[in-house]
Amino acid sequence: MAANVESMFFVRETPWHGLGTKVQEAPTSKDALILAGLDWHVVQEPVYTGQNELVRGYKANVRDSDRKVLGVVTDRYKIVQNEEAFSFTDALLGEGVRYETAGSLQGGKSVWLLAHLPHEYIISGERISPYLLFSNTHDGSGAVKVAITPIRVVCCNTLNLALQTAKRSWSMNHTGNVKDKMEEAKNTLFLADRYMEELGKEFENLRKITLSDKKVMDYICLLYTSPSPRDSTSS
């Protein structure tokens, strides 16, 4: 399947692969979950050999909607359900979250959701509208990852690019106390949002600074002062 997209939704602008459900207005998390085809749960079941012997220490992650095995993981693996990803984003960004895209990749093994941050930022005179990206795997191949990115994720390639180039990101393995780790992520990403806002203000303040003609000439002289005879003959 093109771009490894199993199901997705997008707002207005159709992705290059043409797949998914198009909507005109950003949906709520409840509607986005359904539109993206993510309204299913992962359940863990025992793993058996061909001779019907129990494989200890391992579980199969199974999608409840069609009984598809998404992956085999250790019994220490903690599931993060799709609806928990949306709940996390709702809690972090607050009321009126605008979801841009969300979907399932590689037959449900990987999922993502993309939401607008609540503020636009003006940096060096340019208006920037970054997204909050939440990605998760159900096959045991990767961590839960959350990042701030300007990239509109619509497929495997754009997901990988967004995660690789994100300046602010957070990740969590599917082990230990998952709820505590996700609470920690909220605090980390809240600070990142504040950082972006302050950075935008600082650049805007610098942009407004004007220099007198004399100050400009002083800088030019400083940059282009001829080297002294000692400097020109040294080697």
Model-identified regions with their sequence ranges:
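Feature for intrinsically disordered/low-complexity regulatory segments and propeptides
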Residues: 1-88, 92
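Intrinsic disorder/low-complexity polar-acidic segments
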Residues: 87, 94-226, 230, 235
